[in-house]
Protein backbone atom coordinates (compact mmCIF):
# COMPACT_ATOMS: atom_id res chain seq x y z
CA UNK A 1 0.00 0.00 0.00
CA UNK A 2 1.43 3.36 -0.95
CA UNK A 3 1.30 6.42 1.27
CA UNK A 4 -0.96 8.15 -1.28
CA UNK A 5 -3.81 5.80 -0.34
CA UNK A 6 -3.77 6.88 3.28
CA UNK A 7 -5.60 10.11 4.00
CA UNK A 8 -3.99 12.08 5.53
CA UNK A 9 -0.68 10.73 4.27
CA UNK A 10 2.13 9.61 6.56
CA UNK A 11 4.29 12.37 5.08
CA UNK A 12 1.73 15.02 6.07
CA UNK A 13 1.33 13.54 9.55
CA UNK A 14 5.10 13.50 10.12
CA UNK A 15 5.08 17.29 9.63
CA UNK A 16 3.02 17.52 12.83
CA UNK A 17 5.22 15.36 15.08
CA UNK A 18 8.92 14.71 15.74
CA UNK A 19 9.20 11.21 14.24
CA UNK A 20 7.31 8.00 13.40
CA UNK A 21 7.65 6.68 16.93
CA UNK A 22 5.99 9.82 18.31
CA UNK A 23 3.24 9.53 15.70
CA UNK A 24 2.46 5.95 16.71
CA UNK A 25 2.59 6.75 20.43
CA UNK A 26 0.40 9.85 20.19
CA UNK A 27 -2.10 8.10 17.92
CA UNK A 28 -2.39 5.08 20.21
CA UNK A 29 -2.77 7.16 23.38
CA UNK A 30 -5.40 9.39 21.80
CA UNK A 31 -7.22 6.35 20.38
CA UNK A 32 -7.37 4.85 23.87
CA UNK A 33 -8.81 8.12 25.22
CA UNK A 34 -11.50 8.04 22.53
CA UNK A 35 -12.33 4.41 23.31
CA UNK A 36 -12.64 5.36 26.97
CA UNK A 37 -15.20 8.04 26.12
CA UNK A 38 -13.29 11.23 25.25
CA UNK A 39 -15.08 13.52 22.81
CA UNK A 40 -13.74 13.82 19.26
CA UNK A 41 -12.05 17.13 18.44
CA UNK A 42 -12.79 16.88 14.70
CA UNK A 43 -15.95 16.53 12.66
CA UNK A 44 -15.57 13.40 10.52
CA UNK A 45 -17.90 10.56 9.58
CA UNK A 46 -15.70 7.76 10.91
CA UNK A 47 -16.30 6.25 14.33
CA UNK A 48 -13.01 4.33 14.29
CA UNK A 49 -10.82 5.69 17.12
CA UNK A 50 -7.54 5.43 15.19
CA UNK A 51 -9.00 7.28 12.19
CA UNK A 52 -10.37 10.01 14.45
CA UNK A 53 -7.04 10.32 16.30
CA UNK A 54 -5.08 10.56 13.04
CA UNK A 55 -7.37 13.30 11.76
CA UNK A 56 -7.09 15.17 15.07
CA UNK A 57 -3.30 15.08 14.76
CA UNK A 58 -3.45 16.20 11.13
CA UNK A 59 -5.68 19.17 11.98
CA UNK A 60 -3.38 20.22 14.83
CA UNK A 61 -5.97 19.55 17.54
CA UNK A 62 -3.61 17.33 19.55
CA UNK A 63 -0.57 18.69 21.35
CA UNK A 64 2.10 16.74 23.17
CA UNK A 65 5.19 17.31 25.22
CA UNK A 66 8.40 15.34 24.84
CA UNK A 67 9.80 14.38 28.22
CA UNK A 68 13.58 14.14 28.26
CA UNK A 69 13.73 12.40 31.63
CA UNK A 70 13.32 8.67 31.75
CA UNK A 71 15.02 5.41 32.50
CA UNK A 72 18.78 5.82 32.76
Swiss-Prot record:
Ordered alphabetically, the record's keywords are:
DNA-directed RNA polymerase, Nucleotidyltransferase, Transcription, Transferase
Q: Does the keyword Repressor apply?
A: no
Return the EC number. 2.7.7.6
- Which domain of life does this protein belong to? Bacteria
SMART domains in the record, alphabetically? Answer: RNA_pol_Rpb6
Task: Quote the HAMAP family the UniProt record gives.
Answer: RNApol_bact_RpoZ
Give the record's subunit note.
The RNAP catalytic core consists of 2 alpha, 1 beta, 1 beta' and 1 omega subunit. When a sigma factor is associated with the core the holoenzyme is formed, which can initiate transcription.
Protein name stated in the entry: DNA-directed RNA polymerase subunit omega
Please report the organism this UniProt entry assigns to the protein: Clostridium botulinum (strain Loch Maree / Type A3)
Amino acid sequence: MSNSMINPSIVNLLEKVDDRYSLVTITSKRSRQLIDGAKSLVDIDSTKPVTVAINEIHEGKITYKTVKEGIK
